[in-house]
């Protein structure tokens, strides 16, 4: 039996429309979907990737940013390995709101989670409202990793996940500890997307 690698749960958080789904889609399928459709509830996809000769099984949990779905979020944060907090660099308010998302993650997971702050939509050069320095400073303030991306342009998507797997490699404590946790995932109560549980494999060459 081949090396299945350790499993890690990545939960994507942030306001509606910041590009969480687009980042995941670009990583999963290498393309940008021009047809915007808001995530309903929670979406879940799985991808196996390799980093420095190690295999990582990533569960990507895409959460809805709408207020009416906020009550679903804490239960998905609770057993996460990584929280990816996304904002739109062309929306100052979405950046301001990342503080609340980070605080919610800390309330549920304390220090037992890797937080990554991601400024998406860097292709909107003329509409930028949040500088790189502001993003870096906030990440430093909250002890988070930081990266800017553009799912539309495919910019920094692979490097983002390479950074995440690199951080996971240095923090074994955040991986699932039980083998059954890798397969026994009950999605039925809160799963609404028809894309749920797609699985792919890739190599992360950084």
From Swiss-Prot:
Q: What is the lineage of its organism?
A: Eukaryota, Viridiplantae, Streptophyta, Embryophyta, Tracheophyta
GO MF, one example: GTP binding
Alphabetical UniProt keywords: ER-Golgi transport, Golgi apparatus, GTP-binding, Lipoprotein, Membrane, Methylation, Nucleotide-binding, Prenylation, Protein transport, Transport
Q: Does the keyword Iron apply?
A: no
Question: Which CDD domains does the protein's record reference?
Answer: Rab6
What is the recorded name of this protein?
Answer: Ras-related protein RABH1a
Summary of the function given for this chain in its UniProt record = Protein transport. Regulator of membrane traffic from the Golgi apparatus towards the endoplasmic reticulum (ER).
Q: Which residues are noted in the entry as GTP-binding?
A: 14-21, 62-66, 120-123, 150-151
Post-translational modification Cysteine methyl ester, affected residues: 206
């Amino acid at each position: 039996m081949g090396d299945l690698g350790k499993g890690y749960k990545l939960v994507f958080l942030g306001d509606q429309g910041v590009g969480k789904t687009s980042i995941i889609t670009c990583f999963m399928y290498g393309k940008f979907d021009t047809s915007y459709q808001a995530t309903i509830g929670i979406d879940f996809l799985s991808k196996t990737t390799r980093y420095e000769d190690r295999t990582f099984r990533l569960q990507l949990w895409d959460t809805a940013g709408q207020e009416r779905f906020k009550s679903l979020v804490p239960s998905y944060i609770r057993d996460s390995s990584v929280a990816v907090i996304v904002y739109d660099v062309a929306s100052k308010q979405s950046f301001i709101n990342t503080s609340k998302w980070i605080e919610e993650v800390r309330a549920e997971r304390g220090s037992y989670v890797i937080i990554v702050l991601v400024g998406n939509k860097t292709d909107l050069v003329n509409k930028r409202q949040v500088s790189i320095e502001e993003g870096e400073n906030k990440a430093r303030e909250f002890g988070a990793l930081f990266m800017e991306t553009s799912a539309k342009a495919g910019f920094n998507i692979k490097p983002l996940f390479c950074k995440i797997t690199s951080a996971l490699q240095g923090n074994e404590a955040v991986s699932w500890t039980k083998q059954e946790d890798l397969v026994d995932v009950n999605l039925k109560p809160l799963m609404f997307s028809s894309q749920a549980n797609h699985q792919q494999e890739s190599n992360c060459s950084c």
